[in-house]
Amino acid sequence: MCGLLALVGHAAGAITEETVDTVAGASHLMRHRGPDEPGTWADDQVVLGFNRLSIIDIAHSHQPLRWGPPEQPDRYVLVFNGEIYNYLELREALRAEFGARFATDGDG
């Protein structure tokens, strides 16, 4: 099971470099939950931390997951602990219906 954490500030600008460092330190303490890869992401109101236990696409599916249009690639950011067992079928359906393109086998 992966380890994840989030800190949400109450106002714009609430997240400082010190806050990000604190979350990174807390994430480091949870490295046994996901020893394969740590990751953090922050903006001025939210910090996400993640320790990945790799199952699918071990080399390329990094977290936090980021998605968005080319002009705003970090529009959506997500940490996720779980496995979608029918991901191949979902991928094909998204390709067929919406022309979706994927970057990796785990699309992270």
PLM region spans:
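N-terminus-centric sequence/structural signature that marks the extreme N-terminus
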Residues: M1-G108
